[in-house]
């Protein structure tokens, strides 16, 4: 009997699910990261950052952790803080999904809401959040783990996610994921390319994000991406990326709804992005005699998006429902 003794042991070693498509020359694998205890791949981030801070002596029992997050990192830190005896405050803003905020509270975490007017230095709200997290940590003798620039973040994905993917799909040809702090793809991508330089790494961001384009605009996708005008994280390593591209709110959200209703997979917005893009990418590729193996990082569960992407009224109000996208998905994912 495989009995675990603490929450830490539940992080990682997530399953891979193969799903069929109309293209018999492709094998499509989903790395289901929502099997982590707090429900996303950011459990790996929290685990790596907290372990490194404890080992260095920066984080000690009874201290409070302050972190800027749109939701999943904060959920993971709140969970591990509760398990390890730390206090935790998430620095959030008005754009954070209510479902994620409720989860943070459920783990005993506190919320500090930032506004555009809070910091006299101005700048984008993401930068305001990041500065607020550092300021609160300094004022209270707490700790800001800084998921954006802390090299332990991509290192954690290198040591775990990259290794697991290679063990589960040794002859992988493509890895597709979304990019926010850049840590998951930078870390796992490095690991894969060290073992097979021919593996292609594709990074996706929401249409409107500014990782690879200075011209950004607003979007509803809440996990990946980076708003125009915000200071980009240092953890993004573009040298391992073979391609970058964009997926719209409409494409991601309708894909989420399709997989919930027709495949029994309740996935989040970044997962909707990779599932839609995989279809688009494969359909544009010529038929091959070789079997191509593609792994998609399914970052989190759709349970954190019930109030918007899975809410009919919200989707209608934002004019995001699209029957053609659903039809295309049904024809590809058999």
Regions found by a protein language model. Give the residues of each.
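PLP-dependent amino-acid enzyme catalytic core
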Residues: 1-334
């Amino acid at each position: 009997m495989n009995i675990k003794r603490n929450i830490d042991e539940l992080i990682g070693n997530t399953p891979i699910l193969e799903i069929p498509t109309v293209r018999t020359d492709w094998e499509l694998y989903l790395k289901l990261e929502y099997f982590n205890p707090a429900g996303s791949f950011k459990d790996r981030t929290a685990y790596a950052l907290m372990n490194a801070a404890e080992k260095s002596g920066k984080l000690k029992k009874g201290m409070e952790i302050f972190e800027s997050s749109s939701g999943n990192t904060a959920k993971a830190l709140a969970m591990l803080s509760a398990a390890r005896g730390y206090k935790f405050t998430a620095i959030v803003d008005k754009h954070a999904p209510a479902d994620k905020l409720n989860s943070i509270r459920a783990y005993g975490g506190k919320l500090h809401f930032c506004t555009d007017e809070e910091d006299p230095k101005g700048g984008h709200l993401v930068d305001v959040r990041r500065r607020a997290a550092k300021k609160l940590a300094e004022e209270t003798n707490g700790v800001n783990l800084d998921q954006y620039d802390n090299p332990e973040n991509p290192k954690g994905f290198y040591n775990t996610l990259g290794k697991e993917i290679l063990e589960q799909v040794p002859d992988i040809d493509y890895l597709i994921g979304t990019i926010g702090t850049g840590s998951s793809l930078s870390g796992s991508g490095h690991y894969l390319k060290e073992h097979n330089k021919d593996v292609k790494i594709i990074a996706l961001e929401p249409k409107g994000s500014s990782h690879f384009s200075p011209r950004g605009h607003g979007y509803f996708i809440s996990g990946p991406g980076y708003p125009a005008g915000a200071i980009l994280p240092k953890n993004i390593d573009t040298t391992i990326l073979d391609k970058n591209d964009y997926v719209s709110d409409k494409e991601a959200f309708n894909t989420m709804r399709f997989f919930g209703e027709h495949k029994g997979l309740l996935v989040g917005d970044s997962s909707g992005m990779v599932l839609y893009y995989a279809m688009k990418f494969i359909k544009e590729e010529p038929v091959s005699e070789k079997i191509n193996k593609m792994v998609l990082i399914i970052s989190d569960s759709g349970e954190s998006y019930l109030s918007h992407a899975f809410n009919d009224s919200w989707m209608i109000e934002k004019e995001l429902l699209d029957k053609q996208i659903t039809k295309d998905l049904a024809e590809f994912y058999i």
